[in-house]
Design a protein with these regions (language model features):
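A short gly/proline-enriched turn/hairpin at secondary-structure junctions
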Residues: 37-38
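Conserved N-terminal beta-strand and adjoining loop/helix that marks the start
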Residues: 2-23, 45
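A conserved beta-turn-beta hairpin within the catalytic core of GNAT-like acetyltransferases
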Residues: 31-34
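Unchanged
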Residues: 44-138
Length: 140
């Protein structure tokens, strides 16, 4: 399979900051290692980036109480490792091209609930921004 012929998935991600400017990260249900990520996902047909970001954030964390601080100008993209192409996203994409946002969490931690309709995270925490490179999935 020539993976370069596969398109990039259109996606969004959000850096959620709490009152201490720590970043929300979730431990993925489908990743056995000690790797974490920020809420992110695909853009559905007919959605704009802001709508997709808010939907993904709610679907993954139940968080609604946010204020968007910034929409990053640059899009970021990543390619899946070869062993995951054909498995993730039913083999339709080779990676993701994402629009990222920074948002301030205005609620209480009790608002966060990972037991959603289709849970993606099994655990969550707030971390200092400088620790992100040490904990996030390496190809993202």
């Amino acid at each position: 399979m020539n993976t370069q012929k596969l398109p990039m998935r259109k996606g969004v991600g959000v850096i959620v900051l709490n009152k201490n400017n720590h970043v929300f990260v979730g431990k993925r249900k489908d990743n056995p290692g000690d790797k974490w990520q920020m809420p992110q996902g695909g853009v559905d047909k007919g959605e704009n980036f802001v709508e997709a970001m808010k939907r993904e954030l709610y679907e993954e964390t139940s968080i609604k109480s946010i204020k968007i601080i910034k929409e990053l100008e640059k899009n970021y993209e990543y390619e899946l490792p070869k062993n995951l192409v054909g498995i993730i996203w039913k083999g339709r994409f080779r990676g993701q091209k994402q629009k990222w946002f920074i948002a301030k969490f205005l609620g209480q931690d009790s608002e966060i609930n990972l037991e959603t309709k289709n849970p993606e995270f099994i655990e969550w925490k707030w971390i200092e921004p400088q620790k992100l490179p040490d904990v996030i999935v390496d190809f993202k």
